[in-house]
Design a protein with these regions (language model features):
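ABC family nucleotide-binding domain
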Residues: 1-5, 9-212, 216-221
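C-terminal boundary and immediately downstream tail of ABC-type ATPase nucleotide-binding domains
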Residues: 218, 222-243
């Protein structure tokens, strides 16, 4: 994908969350957003997803400007698959229904086609036996895999992951990261907010570190993680890799 952001700013009340964020990637397959909590990573991701509007600035995906008007955003959101840290599954629906509902209601799939699509993806993710269970009957890892399955069922142009393993224990975290890495290997483009530095190093083409609402450092993993140029980056990595 080609991704460009110019002077993105976003405030919530009196709090300035993004301060003139600029990105320019001619070709990036996997972008990891890292940095301290409250740095603006998730807000930037939500703007890319069309779930938040910037107060100022512009965003382009593959040379197409994202127009932040509701009519345009409805079309944009349909092309983006987003996976949140809290799963965001419908608690009253089964695993299967959590996938078929958006296919039918948002993407206008016929019910039979939606069901076949969902069953195929559940089989691929080794979740077929859980298709009629509610989210409450599933483990955290299973719920997150359902959320990922729902995101890719729409055949998105871009996948967005917002700290998808932050609520999981280490063993389940590894399971979910393996799924994400498989999707990367299959050629899906995605942007990933993560605190998993080892994983970011392995899967990302580019890494951007945000702190205080600004891009502090941006480049390939070998630069940002192995030979950081910014003192803020060095301090962040020293803290997160200490234990």
């Amino acid at each position: 994908m080609k991704l460009e952001a110019k002077d993105l700013c976003k405030s919530f009340g009196q709090q300035l969350v993004l301060r003139n964020v600029n990105l320019n990637f001619e070709k990036v397959h996997t972008l990891a957003l890292i940095g301290p909590s409250g740095g603006g990573k998730s807000t930037l991701l939500r703007i890319i997803a069309g779930l938040e509007r910037p107060d100022e600035g512009n965003l382009w995906l593959d040379d197409q400007e994202v127009i932040f008007r509701e009519r345009n955003l409805l079309v944009h959101r349909k092309s983006i698959g987003t996976v949140f840290q809290a799963y965001n599954l419908f608690p009253h629906l089964t695993a299967l229904q959590n996938i078929t509902l958006p296919l039918e209601k948002v993407h206008r799939y016929k019910p039979q086609v939606a069901r076949e699509t969902a069953e195929e993806i559940l089989e691929r993710f080794q979740l077929a036996e859980h298709c009629h269970k509610s989210p409450a009957q599933l483990s955290g890892g299973q719920r997150q895999r359902i959320a990922i399955a729902r995101a890719i069922a729409i055949k998105p142009r871009l996948l967005l992951f917002d700290e998808p393993t932050s609520a999981l224990d280490p063993e389940i975290t590894a399971e979910v990261l393996e799924v994400i890495e498989e999707l990367r290997d299959e050629g899906l483009d995605f942007v990933l907010v993560t605190h998993q530095m080892g994983f970011a190093h392995r899967v990302a083409d580019q890494i951007a570190l945000l702190s205080g609402g600004r891009i502090v450092e941006c480049g390939p993993p070998t630069q940002v993680l192995d030979q950081p140029q910014s003192e803020i980056t060095r301090q962040f990595l020293a803290k997160i890799l200490k234990y």
